């Protein structure tokens, strides 16, 4: 009997083991099915296949088994699955480590996770999980040491149930949408070493009870959270702390001196808050400190002398504060300092001349202070210096010779000082330099004959004393976008070679002693947006072919001796908003119609032999001109008429033939149920249905037979018969995007020549039409603010909730469309890189954005990122406030951002109220001033010159949707 019992027990154990093995295999296969969404590739987890082998699942990629073939670790990383995590995860009840990260998984977490009682590591970071985080799933996870939910879409309050995890060492809920306060109970994690709650929407005060976390080494609470109050002084008692970050968190008050007790701290990041007072000298007790960032606050006073004890410092960021006094001499003695950025303060006196002598400097920026004396000579002793920026100070003397051979340099900016002497010639041959700004100084001498640099995108030498000829070797600067040589003493002719530069967008050589004619090659530089040759001694005529400059916005050749007739082809240059031909020797009659309707008489003043059609002095000239050409016209008309008749016959034949062919060739690809056919869409491509034209193509309104209205965008230069540059795959990705503030892509119709995108129809047109047309007066401030919030939410979705993120590349008021309820929808996202016209130059097709909206760094990097979109959105906010277009209304070469900065300088007593009152849209009869000021300040944050200093779109949404209480009051009339 005893033997039978043992036998049955052994049989039962064997059955249980076999069942568990089969159960693990079955669970993995079901997990694969649920995690693979419709967008997943067929080869995702391709080795996860059914097998009769008891241990087959142990060889699956990312699977680790114990000696009993039970799954104890599952790691599915960076597999684009796009599905969800199913309840079968709970059947893998021997799991000790679960890592499912960067897989684009969506939905809520299954409660069956609570069955994983052996789990030590739970990592679900970098996915799209949503809903409240189910804290009760952790009740049975008594062994859990690491919980990482970073970068998901969780919302609601932070879960308090997890405080029962007494072995927890690592906790990250960063990068989500958690709201409410930080629970006091989080101080009960006795073994917690890392706590990351940054990048959420948390409010309230930072609990001082967090000081009870005596094992804590890293604490990150900032970015997008908006706490009330300041930094709890009690945090200074966490002696184990090595990394403390509470940036961009709405902190107020002063920096607690008690933080100086954190002797093991190596990184302190408190930037982008509202901290005031002085920098506590007690911080010098943090002898391990390597990185100190207190930038973008309201700190005052001087840099404490006691900081000389911080020998391990590698980074000092104090920029955008109100610090004063001198930059202490000991800064130059810090042996490990790599980054010194103290721009936009009130520092004065002379810089320590030993700065950089430690041989470690990489980033150096002291812009916008009151510094004097000479620039330190050894800044590039390290041979690693990347940024050398000293603009807007009172430096004198030459640029140190050590800058010339500094091959690591990427940015040289010394404008607006009193520097003089010749420029070290090596500067113009640096291989990595992207920007050289020497303007508004007293530099002299000639430019070197040989200039090179594949990375140089911005060369600005304006308002100096340079002489000699402009080197033809500038043709070697293949990345050059901006060339500013105005207000110097250059002579000779304009080198024709310059206009062979493939991405040159702006050239200003006004105010020199240049002679000769305008090079004919200028008409071949199709990327040009602004040309200024004014105030020279140029002769000859404006070259033919100007209409080739399709994106030219500014053309100024005033105050020269240019002669001949004004080219009639200018009438077709629809992008040209500023034309100045004044004070030359032009003759004949000013053309009319077309783009000439945009210009006023000042554009042509000072040309004695030039007349306007409406002037009586032109009557006889017009009569003689018409009579002398009458016979010639008769012959031409006859030839044209005969040719036209022939062309009509041929065209009608071809149209019939093509129509029969096209009816078979069009294909409709729908991203949702559409109750119309491709042929119905094509039938709407008529002149009378056009509702918009732009760089992206022509937009038609299409009314389908079932009563549906759609917007049909006919893209330029794209068809399925050509190399589609990933077009189909990308468009299908865009078609899956769903957000109430994103204009929905319904589908597309295509043949071998053309792609037609089908969008929701927006009956109220674009924001640009309402702001800059006759309708502008009907947009109240409340409506403008609402549109700003909705457009920001749409962009935020593209940047933060799409994987991979989508960069719009062409944010502007004309790409923000309004539905019947005036709700804003972001349009044309992700299309800019596909607008390739095979008939245009590559430089043309690569331009990202619209003139006036393009971020300044694009000029020298030729790259866009999400911060480029943020800059463009900031311009849109300024449009909403000011009611004016971003360019064309502020004078030659001045955009809306430059105009605001100029206006601020001209104010007698500058203040936010005075500046906003000076620039606000006069059509707004009444508005809450504090609300306008609030949005204005957000806009100015977005258009900061340096991309990293701009907020993210998440931060913009948070700021716009959480204004101070006072912004809803104070309605005034001005």
Curated annotation (Swiss-Prot):
Which InterPro entries does the record associate with it?
Answer: Kinase-like_dom_sf, Leu-rich_rpt, Leu-rich_rpt_typical-subtyp, LRR_dom_sf, LRR_N_plant-typ, Plant_LRR-RLKs, Prot_kinase_dom, Ser/Thr_kinase_AS
Write down the Gene3D superfamilies for this protein, in alphabetical order. Answer: Phosphorylase Kinase, domain 1, Ribonuclease Inhibitor, Transferase(Phosphotransferase) domain 1
Q: In which tissues is it expressed?
A: Expressed in roots and shoots. Expressed in the vasculature of leaves, petioles, stems and roots.
Question: Could you say what a knockout of this gene produces?
Answer: Dramatic increase in root nodule number when inoculated with Sinorhizobium meliloti. Inhibition of root growth in both the presence and absence of rhizobia. Increase in arbuscular mycorrhizal (AM) fungus colonization intensity in roots (hypermycorrhizal phenotype) when inoculated with AM fungi.
Give the binding site residues for ATP: 691-699, 713
Q: Which GO terms describe its molecular function?
A: ATP binding; protein serine kinase activity; protein serine/threonine kinase activity; receptor serine/threonine kinase binding
In this chain the Protein kinase domain maps to 685-972
The LRR repeats extend over 92-116, 117-141, 143-165, 166-188, 189-213, 238-262, 263-286, 288-309, 310-334, 335-358, 360-382, 383-406, 407-430, 431-454, 456-477, 478-501, 503-525, 527-549, 550-573, 574-598
Query: Which Pfam families does UniProt cross-reference here?
Result: LRR_1, LRR_8, LRRNT_2, Pkinase
Annotated membrane topology is:
Single-pass type I membrane protein
Changing residue 575 to R: reported impact?
A: In sunn-2; dramatic increase in root nodule number when infected by Sinorhizobium meliloti, and inhibition of root growth in both the presence and absence of rhizobia
Tell me the SUPFAM superfamilies matching this sequence. L domain-like, Protein kinase-like (PK-like), RNI-like
* Tagged with keyword Transmembrane: yes
Catalysed reaction, written as an equation = L-seryl-[protein] + ATP = O-phospho-L-seryl-[protein] + ADP + H(+); L-threonyl-[protein] + ATP = O-phospho-L-threonyl-[protein] + ADP + H(+)
User: What role does this protein play?
Assistant: LRR receptor kinase involved in the regulation of root growth and root nodule organogenesis. Involved in long distance nodulation signaling events. Involved in the autoregulation of nodulation (AON), a long distance systemic signaling from root to shoot and back again, which allows legumes to limit the number of root nodules formed based on available nitrogen and previous rhizobial colonization. Acts from shoot to root to control AON. Interacts with CLE12 and CLE13 signaling to control nodule numbers.
Return the protein name: Leucine-rich repeat receptor-like kinase protein SUNN
Q: Which organism is it from?
A: Medicago truncatula
Per the record, the gene is SUNN
């Amino acid at each position: 009997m005893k033997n039978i019992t043992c036998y049955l027990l052994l049989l039962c154990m064997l059955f249980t083991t076999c069942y568990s093995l089969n159960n693990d295999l079955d669970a993995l296969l079901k997990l694969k099915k649920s995690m693979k969404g419709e967008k997943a590739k067929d080869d995702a987890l391709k080795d996860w296949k059914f097998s009769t082998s008891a241990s087959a699942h142990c060889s699956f990629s990312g699977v680790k088994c114990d000696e009993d073939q039970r799954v104890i670790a599952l790691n599915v990383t960076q597999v684009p699955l796009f599905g969800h995590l199913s309840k079968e995860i709970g059947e893998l009840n021997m799991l000790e480590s679960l890592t499912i990260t960067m897989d684009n998984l969506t939905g809520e977490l299954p409660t069956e996770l609570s069955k994983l009682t052996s789990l030590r590591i739970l990592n679900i970071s970098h996915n799209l999980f949503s809903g409240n985080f189910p804290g009760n799933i952790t009740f049975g996870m008594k062994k859990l040491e690491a919980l990482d939910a970073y970068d998901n879409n969780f919302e609601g309050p932070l879960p308090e149930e997890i405080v029962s995890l007494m072995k927890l060492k690592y906790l990250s809920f960063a990068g989500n949408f958690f709201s409410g306060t930080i629970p006091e109970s989080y101080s009960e994690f006795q073994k917690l070493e890392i706590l990351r709650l940054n990048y959420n929407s948390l409010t309230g005060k930072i609990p001082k009870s967090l000081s009870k976390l005596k094992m804590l080494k890293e604490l990150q609470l900032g970015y997008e959270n908006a706490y009330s109050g300041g930094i709890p002084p009690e945090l200074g008692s966490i002696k184990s702390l090595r990394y403390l970050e509470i940036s961009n968190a709405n902190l107020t008050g002063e920096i607690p001196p008690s933080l100086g007790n954190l002797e093991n701290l190596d990184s302190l990041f408190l930037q982008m808050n509202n901290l005031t007072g002085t920098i506590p000298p007690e911080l010098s007790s943090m002898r391990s400190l390597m990185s100190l960032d207190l930038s973008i606050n309201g700190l005052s006073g001087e840099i404490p002398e006691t900081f000389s004890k911080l020998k391990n410092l590698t980074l000092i960021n104090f920029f955008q504060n109100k610090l004063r006094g001198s930059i202490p001499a000991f800064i130059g003695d810090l042996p490990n300092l790599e980054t010194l950025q103290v721009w936009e303060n009130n520092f004065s006196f002379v810089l320590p001349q030993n700065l950089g002598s430690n041989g470690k400097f990489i980033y150096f920026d002291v812009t916008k202070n009151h510094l004097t004396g000479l620039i330190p000579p050894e800044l590039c002793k390290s041979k690693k210096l990347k940024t050398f920026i000293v603009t807007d100070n009172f430096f004198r003397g030459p640029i140190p010779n050590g800058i010339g051979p500094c091959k690591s340099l990427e940015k040289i900016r010394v404008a607006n000082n009193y520097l003089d002497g010749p420029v070290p010639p090596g500067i113009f041959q640096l291989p990595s330099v992207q920007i050289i700004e020497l303007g508004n100084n007293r530099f002299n001498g000639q430019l070197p004959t040989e200039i090179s640099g594949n990375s140089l995108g911005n060369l600005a030498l304006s308002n100096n004393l340079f002489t000699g000829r402009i080197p033809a070797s500038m043709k070697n600067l293949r990345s050059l976008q901006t060339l500013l040589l105005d207000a110097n003493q250059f002579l000779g002719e304009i080198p024709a070679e310059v206009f062979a530069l493939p991405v040159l967008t702006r050239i200003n050589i006004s105010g020199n002693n240049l002679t000769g004619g305008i090079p004919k090659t200028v008409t071949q530089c199709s990327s040009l947006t602004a040309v200024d040759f004014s105030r020279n001694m140029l002769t000859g005529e404006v070259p033919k072919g100007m209409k080739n400059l399709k994106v030219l916005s500014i053309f100024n050749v005033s105050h020269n001796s240019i002669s001949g007739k004004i080219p009639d082809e200018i009438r077709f240059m629809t992008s040209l908003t500023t034309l100045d031909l004044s004070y030359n020797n032009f003759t004949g009659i000013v053309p009319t119609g077309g783009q000439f309707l945009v210009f006023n008489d000042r554009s042509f003043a000072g040309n004695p032999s030039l007349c306007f059609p409406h002037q009586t002095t032109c009557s006889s000239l017009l009569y003689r001109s018409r009579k002398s050409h009458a016979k010639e016209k008769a012959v031409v008309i006859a030839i044209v008429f005969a040719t036209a008749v022939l062309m009509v016959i041929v065209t009608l034949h071809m149209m019939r033939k093509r129509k029969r062919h096209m009816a078979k060739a069009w294909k409709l690809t729908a991203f949702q149920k559409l109750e119309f056919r491709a042929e119905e869409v094509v039938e709407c491509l008529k002149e009378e249905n056009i509702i918009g034209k732009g760089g992206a193509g022509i937009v038609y309104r299409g009314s389908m037979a079932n009563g549906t209205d759609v917007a049909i965008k006919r893209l330029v230069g794209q068809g399925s018969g050509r190399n589609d540059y990933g077009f189909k795959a990308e468009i299908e990705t865009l078609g899956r995007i769903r957000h109430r503030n994103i204009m929905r892509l319904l589908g597309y119709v295509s043949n071998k020549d053309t792609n037609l995108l089908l969008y929701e129809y927006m009956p109220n047109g674009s924001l640009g039409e309402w702001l800059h047309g006759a309708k502008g007066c009907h947009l109240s401030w409340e409506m403008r603010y609402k549109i700003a919030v909705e457009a920001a939410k749409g962009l935020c979705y593209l940047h933060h909730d799409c994987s991979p993120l989508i960069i719009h590349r062409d944010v502007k008021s004309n790409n923000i469309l309004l539905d019947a309820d005036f709700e804003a929808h972001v349009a044309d996202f992700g299309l800019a890189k596909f607008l390739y016209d095979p008939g245009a130059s590559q430089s043309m097709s690569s331009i990202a954005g619209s003139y006036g909206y393009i971020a300044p760094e694009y000029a020298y990097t030729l790259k866009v990122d999400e911060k480029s979109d943020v800059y463009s959105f900031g311009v849109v906010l300024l449009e909403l406030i000011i009611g004016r277009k971003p360019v064309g209304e502020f004078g030659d070469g001045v955009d809306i951002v430059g105009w605001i900065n100029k206006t601020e300088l001209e104010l007698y007593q500058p203040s936010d109220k005075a500046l906003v009152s000076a620039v606000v849209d006069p059509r707004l009869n009444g508005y809450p001033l504090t609300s306008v000021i609030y949005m204005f300040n957000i806009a100015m944050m977005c258009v900061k010159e340096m991309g990293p200093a701009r907020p993210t779109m998440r931060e913009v949404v948070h700021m716009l949707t959480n204004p101070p209480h006072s912004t809803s009051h104070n309605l005034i009339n001005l």
